[in-house]
Regions:
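Short catalytic-loop micro-motif centered on adjacent basic/acidic residues
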Residues: 13, 33-36, 60-63, 150-151
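Active-site HxH/HxHxD metal-binding segment of metal-dependent hydrolases
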Residues: 45, 49-135, 231
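Short acidic-hydrophobic surface loop/beta-edge motif
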Residues: 5-6, 26, 137-145, 211
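Accessory terminal helices/loops
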Residues: 201-205, 215-299
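Short, conserved active-site entrance elements at the starts or edges of catalytic domains
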Residues: 1, 123-152
């Protein structure tokens, strides 16, 4: 059964057991925003049932990124009447490209979704995306009725399409922040992730940061995650420059568990070989001043 926590008046975290997922719910006077919908119809229905215990408002959905546990419940919400699904441009592209492949990842907990059979198993892709090219920081605002919500992209991190959702002093961060376990680096851009975390930590209006999995944290946790990742990057550079390579011994030099460290080293080597860390410019202080959730977006 889903666990519901009201962080602020009308701002809820809805936690479900599978993947320790945190979904969000923000209430306005005219509609409500749902942040992340789970990995399939079973989890999606559990989240929806918890929401309907709180409100019967029409629903809008935001997906924080294109990993299966954050969007494969979209069809449940489409059938419940949601017509707007927000995400980053690259998130929409990734869902379209790898969504069918990702079904295999949920086949145990969500057998219907894994097989693509039954009610609410179709892939529902974003209908609305953040403005701009998708490479630089961007934002958009949604009015829920006397309740503005900001969707913003600070740069690559856990993926190339991580969107945060800010309301009042609360921000839903998806897997840009990971609490209770090491970060997942399968699709990550480690150096850019550090930059995005540090940019997030400068947004002084936010005091409660809701990770995609785990318990809400403070800005100190965000900074600590950035510091730990920066240490891992430096040690990965040392390994990469040596003749040792991403060996078993090298894994234990990183501040992560061995399996995660191996993925990190492999990902770092791939990015280094492709020079991917320079694929997009870093988030600068000027961009934060002109394109942050605290100020109107520039033209």
């Amino acid at each position: 059964m889903a666990r519901t926590q009201e962080l602020r008046p009308g701002v809820y975290v809805i936690g479900t057991e599978n993947w320790r997922l945190n979904s969000g719910l923000v209430l306005g006077t005219q509609r409500a925003l749902v942040v992340d919908t789970g990995a399939g119809p079973r989890q999606g229905r559990e989240i929806l049932a918890a929401i309907r215990e709180i409100t019967d408002l029409p629903l809008t959905v935001a997906n924080t990124h294109a990993h299966y546990d954050h969007y494969m419940g979209n069809a449940v919400f489409a059938r419940a009447g949601a017509t707007e699904f927000w995400a980053h441009k690259a998130c929409a592209s990734a869902m379209a490209e790898v969504g069918e492949y990702q079904r295999s990842f949920v086949s145990t907990q969500e057998p219907e979704m894994g097989a693509g059979e039954g009610i609410d198993t179709r892939l529902v892709l974003p209908t609305n995306t953040l403005p701009g090219t998708g490479l630089r920081p961007s934002l958009t605002r949604i009015d829920l009725g006397e309740r503005p919500v900001t969707l913003f992209f600070l740069g690559p991190g856990h993926t190339d399409n991580d969107v945060c959702v800010g309301v009042d002093d609360v921000v839903f961060c998806g897997d840009l922040i990971e609490e209770g376990a090491d970060p997942n680096f399968e699709d990550a851009f480690p150096q850019r992730w550090v930059e995005s975390l540090r940019a997030l930590a400068t947004l002084e209006r936010y005091t409660a940061f809701v990770p995609g999995h785990g318990t809400p944290v403070s800005v100190n946790f965000v900074t600590q995650q950035a510091d730990t990742m920066e240490l891992a990057i430096q040690r990965a550079r040392d390994v990469h420059r040596s003749e040792e390579g991403p060996s078993t011994a090298a894994m234990y030099r990183l501040p992560y568990q061995a399996g995660v460290a191996r993925v990190f080293l492999d990902r770092w080597a791939l990015i280094a070989s492709q020079d991917a860390a320079d694929a997009t410019p870093p988030t600068t202080p000027e961009q934060l001043r002109t394109q942050s959730p605290d100020t109107p977006p520039s033209a």
